[in-house]
A protein has these predicted regions:
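Active-site cofactor/cluster-binding pocket
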Residues: 2-201
């Protein structure tokens, strides 16, 4: 995408406790089963697709910063802009990784684990969904209604989550980017919800 770039690289956390290698999920008999964190051995990559003014750049900064300072991970973030005008397309990229694996690239995220779409109009742009695999997750902001036809381009095994971030933000006196980050942490528990809430405060 043409345009400028804002970068905010964060390195290894200093003085932070290492992130837990596993989380747990409930089982049918009421117990719990260990679930390996996706950042234990590799990078976990997120791409925020947005338009200027909706807070995607801030969301990326907060997420990467919280990962480094509060979760004991490595993290890096930068954004690219179609132009500096409000309402122009914005892409915000976040890479997270284990504390012992430095992040040495600032290349755009082309094969994301997660795509978060801040405005459903961006589904009309073919590159918005580019790179999402069958193991990936799409989170998109839209009111309740019929499924957008553009989602038919996704692999059938990809996870798709719709959230009416604007409605929730109004009801909770919050911001849509905070709602979308909360949705992200609900799906991926290694992004500790409490930690993100503290970072957003």
């Amino acid at each position: 995408m043409a345009g400028g770039r804002k970068a905010g690289r964060a390195g290894k956390a200093h003085g932070a406790k290492p992130a837990a290698a596993v989380t747990t999920k409930p089982t049918a008999n009421g117990g719990s089963q260990a679930e390996e964190s996706p950042v234990q051995h590799r990078f976990f990559e997120i791409r925020f697709e947005s338009i200027g003014g909706l807070g995607a750049h801030a969301a990326g900064q907060i997420l990467a910063g919280a990962a480094v300072l509060r979760m004991g991970l490595n993290g890096a973030h930068f954004s690219s802009y179609g132009s500096e005008k409000k309402g122009s397309p914005v892409r915000s990229f976040v890479r997270l990784g284990p504390a012992n694996k430095p992040i040495r690239t600032s290349a755009p995220v082309e094969s994301p684990d997660v795509i978060v779409i801040f405005h459903s109009v961006l589904l009309n742009i073919p590159t918005t969904l580019a790179g999402l695999t069958g193991q990936g997750t799409l989170i998109y902001n839209a009111p309740a209604g019929s499924c957008p036809p553009e989602l038919a381009r996704l692999p059938k095994t990809a996870k798709v989550v719709r959230v009416d971030a604007l409605k929730i933000a109004v009801e909770e006196k919050s911001r849509p980017n905070a709602v979308l980050m909360g949705t992200l942490s609900a799906i991926f528990p290694f992004l500790t919800p409490k930690v993100l809430l503290e970072a957003l405060a």
